[in-house]
Design a protein with these regions (language model features):
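Conserved small/polar residues in nucleotide/adenosyl-binding loops
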Residues: 391-394
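Membrane-interface "cap" regions at the ends of multi-pass membrane proteins
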Residues: 10-66, 233, 260-263
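Helix-loop-helix connectors at the membrane interface of multi-pass transporters/channels
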Residues: 107-121, 143-162, 251-276, 301-306, ...
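Flexible loop linkers connecting adjacent transmembrane helices
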Residues: 20-45, 69-71, 77, 85, ...
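Hydrophobic, membrane-embedded alpha-helices of multi-pass small-molecule transporters
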Residues: 48-64, 201-209, 218-280, 322-331
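Extracellular/periplasmic helix-exit of transmembrane alpha-helices
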Residues: 205-215, 269-306, 376-377
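Hydrophobic alpha-helical segments and their helix-loop junctions in multi-pass secondary transporters
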Residues: 138-142, 146-155, 160-161, 173-174, ...
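Transmembrane alpha-helical segments of multi-pass small-molecule transport proteins
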Residues: 126-133, 152-178, 193-196, 353-370
């Protein structure tokens, strides 16, 4: 537990030290933000900072800091190091500058910012690349949550019903003003995920399980170590628990809602550090699980269910179900919303009117429905789309 505690403290100290240094490098000032200068009641809407933080945290987190950290824990104490060092020096820095550049440039989406610094050709490539990525993300995260919801209602509502419900929610979350659905639901889901993480953290110190220490060595403890080396597999497994390029596509959503550049460090850098803390907690909890039950289990959702029910009881089980269902849904809806904004930016279409939003959303959702039907009808369809997503993820 000593290494775990030191890593936890390092993440907190990193926010106040290295995060402040990065803030000085960027140099936020008192200029008016896009939420104030371009307010349109749809995407550019001033929101409270605490709510922006919660939305940003859930936007970038999803299932990554839970499932990824659990699988990464099989590699031993080196997973702790990657989560801590990656979050402080890579992930949070990336997220902060991605968000602040969008904030400084009128809330522009990722491809437009890239075009400012790398030229027109790169911008055009990133426009197509990023929109495809967002549609793939949204399409992938429909059937999974719907299947889990169907298991909760096996006698009354089947998977087809829940697929329709989830997709209908995606359409509404993409079209409606950001404060109508995302601004109301996301903070609640974020609080649930944080409450679950804090509960696990408390139980770690109550149970005080034997966790690997750095001085025991950084050897690969994965039972398939010969086939799954620490580099690159551990880094890929933990992924957004330390750094993810996907976050840069999400930050402009909140850059359009901030009322001060000085809120950037708590929102962008702070949300990534919080994700790192959540990932560290789950990596430690998974290490305990593997120590008690062996490493044969590879289904992260089973491990989450077992840990939360054992340590947090019925409430923990409910939170686990909520997290496993809500996290992918909140990744899917903001992916579609990001795609709409990216297309609107490069076509120069204002998004205040519903009609212009529909111009973009109708063909986008038609394409998504096609991908979804392909994944459902073809036994290998989902795997094919998932591999495409992995290949295109920045």
């Amino acid at each position: 537990m000593i290494t775990f505690t030191l890593c936890l403290l390092a993440l907190i100290v990193g926010y106040f030290t290295y995060g402040r240094l990065m803030e000085r490098v960027f140099g936020p000032d008192d200029r008016k933000t896009p939420a104030l200068t371009k307010a349109d009641g749809v995407d550019y809407i001033p929101l409270p900072t605490w709510k922006i933080f919660m939305i940003q945290f859930l936007n970038i987190a999803g299932l990554g800091p839970i499932f990824g950290a659990i699988m990464g824990a099989k590699f031993g104490s080196s997973s702790y190091l990657w989560i801590v060092l990656g979050s402080i020096f890579a992930g949070a820095v990336h997220d902060y500058f991605a968000g602040m550049l969008s904030l400084r440039h009128e809330g522009e989406s990722l491809p437009e910012i890239i075009g400012r610094y790398l030229g027109l050709t790169t911008k055009q490539i990133m426009r197509g690349f990023t929109v495809i990525l967002m549609i793939l993300v949204g399409s992938v995260f429909v059937a999974g949550p719907a299947g889990l919801l169907a298991k909760l209602t096996p006698e009354s509502l089947d998977a087809t019903f829940w697929i329709i419900v989830v997709f209908a929610y995606y359409i509404l979350a993409t079209l409606l003003p950001v404060d109508k659905i995302i601004g109301k639901i996301y903070p609640l889901f974020a609080i649930a995920l944080l409450f679950m993480a804090v509960g696990i953290l408390v139980m770690l110190y109550v149970n005080h399980p034997a966790l690997p220490e750095l001085w025991d060595g950084l050897q690969n403890t994965n039972p398939e170590a010969s086939e799954l080396p620490i580099f690159p597999i551990m880094f890929v497994s933990i992924a957004c628990g330390a750094i993810s390029g996907f976050h840069a596509t999400q930050s402009p959503l909140m850059a359009r809602c901030m009322t001060s550049e000085r809120h950037g460090r708590p929102v962008f850098y702070g949300a990534m550090i919080t994700e790192g803390i959540v990932a560290l907690i789950w990596a430690a909890a998974a290490t305990y699980f593997f120590h008690e039950n062996g490493m044969e289990e590879s289904n992260a959702s089973v491990i989450v269910d077992a840990i939360t029910k054992e340590w947090l009881g019925t409430i923990g089980g409910v939170l686990a179900i909520l997290g496993v269902i809500a996290a992918p849904i909140t990744s899917g809806d903001t992916a579609f919303r990001s795609a709409r904004l990216i297309v609107a930016d490069f076509l120069g279409l204002e998004q205040k009117s519903m009609r212009r939003r529909l111009y973009i959303c109708i063909p986008m959702f038609v394409a998504a429905i096609g991908l979804l039907l392909y994944s459902l009808r073809d036994a290998n369809g989902f795997n094919m789309i998932w591999r495409c997503l992995l290949y295109t993820s920045p």
